Swiss-Prot record:
Pfam families: Pribosyltran
Subcellular location: Cytoplasm
EC number from the UniProt entry: 2.4.2.7
Gene, per the UniProt record: apt
Recorded superkingdom: Bacteria
Name under which the protein is recorded: Adenine phosphoribosyltransferase
Organism: Gloeobacter violaceus (strain ATCC 29082 / PCC 7421)
GO biological process, one term: adenine salvage
Pathway: Purine metabolism; AMP biosynthesis via salvage pathway; AMP from adenine: step 1/1
Length: 171
């Protein structure tokens, strides 16, 4: 199955000059969604993750069913102010701005092997911030899983050395 057939491109969103890769059309199609989760599981299952971390918010959509498929726990990494207990916070730069992410300080019992999942790898800033949060919370990142990689932004080069990185679709 070619997942590009299920991903809509929206020009000038969220800013002029950005080509937004919209995965809501993929989520709409049960066979494409199942294929996506099955493909991620097939390519990351051997990593032996104890937890899947999903990055807010589209990482939740793929991370939670992947965690179920891999028989792992799920840990959300959220935007600031959304988690109720004590958190670690990391700031990062996006393709089109700046932001921050947070994780509960007690998210993992060390040693925990963690797979970080998001819908998109662009500049790498979000994934790197999530990986730093995982480490601060006592986990070890064993891999990254993405639905889409924007290769022209070279975000993969910014990911930490060691953990594997999987992207199902490249633009």
């Amino acid at each position: 199955m070619d997942l590009k057939d299920y991903i809509r491109t929206v020009p000038d969103f969220p800013e002029p000059g950005i080509l937004f890769r919209d995965i809501t059309t993929l989520l709409h199609e049960p066979k494409a969604l199942r294929y996506t989760i099955d493909s991620l599981a097939e390519q990351t299952g051997s990593l032996g993750a104890d937890y899947v971390v999903g990055i807010e918010s589209r990482g939740f959509m793929f991370g939670t069913p992947l965690a179920i498929k891999l028989d792992c726990g799920f840990v959300p990494v959220r935007k600031p102010g959304k988690l109720p207990a004590a958190v670690f916070k990391e700031e990062y730069t996006l393709e089109y701005g700046k932001n921050a992410l947070e994780i509960h300080q007690d998210a993992f019992a060390a040693p925990s092997r963690v797979l970080v999942v998001d819908d998109l790898l662009a500049t790498g800033g979000t994934a790197v911030a999530a990986a730093q949060l995982v480490e601060r919370a006592g986990g070890t990142v064993v891999g990254f899983g993405f639905i889409i990689e924007l290769t022209f932004l070279n975000g993969r080069a910014k990911l930490p050395e060691g953990p594997s990185a999987v992207a199902l679709v490249s633009y």
